[in-house]
A protein has these predicted regions:
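Non-globular targeting/processing and membrane-anchoring segments
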Residues: 1-114, 131-137, 141, 148-256
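Short loop/edge segments at beta-strand edges and connector loops
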Residues: 122-123, 144-146
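Catalytic nucleophile loop
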Residues: 113-129
């Protein structure tokens, strides 16, 4: 595999149009089967049983103390993204994955038309993390969940990790209907979906690619460049401040 910055990158075999189309048609059969299987899996989610969650679980929002039930904003369903947070650390050291995926959730009107609210539940202090939201220009509802609330909301799961959790409201009763983590949160992503359509793909070492295909340098995080999350750079270049107001708390943090 080649370094992504190399001028000597591999390239596929050049063929005539009919040969190209024949290969693409064969792949399309697999793509359509994949799409149909995705529909079947989505249907299975709709048949899952549900579990009761305490709707009075406290959160902190823009106007202060609220509850999980309040986060529905009157709608029947809620999708909550649980954002990883490094308390007391600067913006450059906040979670690059959560930052990447959250940056791709912008237009919520279609969700709202289906009676779904989308919100971020940050696993850190509200004031500090809300500054980060403002720096990144995000407009979705933003809440902070303290450790006690997280024990309730993420029972049986690893607190501090990224999660998507889906909820249903029936009157004042709240139920959890689905959750996922790790690569499951790619449901929020469109950049990787587009990269997957290109000849060089995601350009990451784990991919099955021909010899000579580019990849990011060994040891370089795929979501970071220049010492911070990639998607922070346009905000800085546009003049937005990344000051989270927590510099007095800063201390060295070991990178693993």
């Amino acid at each position: 595999m080649k370094d992504i910055t190399s001028d000597e990158l591999g390239a596929p075999e050049i063929v005539d149009r009919s040969t190209f189309q024949a290969e693409l048609d064969a792949l399309r059969v697999r793509e359509k089967a994949h799409t149909r299987e995705g529909d079947v899996i989505a249907a299975a989610r709709r048949w899952l049983p549900i579990v009761t969650v305490d709707g009075t679980t406290p959160l902190i929002g823009e106007r202060g103390a609220v509850t999980l039930l309040d986060a529905f904003e009157g709608r029947r369903m809620l999708i909550a993204y649980y954002f990883m947070w490094h308390t007391g650390r600067p913006a450059s050291e906040q979670c690059e994955g959560c930052t990447l995926y959250t940056s791709q959730v912008r237009e919520l009107s279609l969700l709202h038309s289906r009676d779904v609210t989308y919100a971020t539940f940050c696993q850190g202090p509200y004031d500090e993390s809300a500054r980060y939201r403002d720096f990144m220009g995000w407009e979705m509802p933003w809440y902070s969940a303290d450790p006690n609330s997280l024990k309730t909301l993420l029972v049986g799961r690893r607190v501090g990790m990224m999660h998507i959790v889906c909820y249903l409201r029936q009157g004042a009763n709240v139920f959890e209907t689905y959750w996922t983590t790790m690569r499951g949160v790619e449901a929020m992503d469109n950049s990787y979906r587009l990269l997957d359509l290109t000849v060089y793909g995601r350009q990451e070492a784990w991919e099955d690619s021909p010899a000579g295909w580019p990849q990011r340098p060994k040891g370089e995080h795929p979501y970071r460049t220049g010492g911070r999350p990639i998607v922070q750079w346009p905000r800085l270049k546009a003049g937005h401040s990344d000051d989270l107001g927590n510099s007095r708390l800063a201390r060295p943090r070991r990178h693993q």
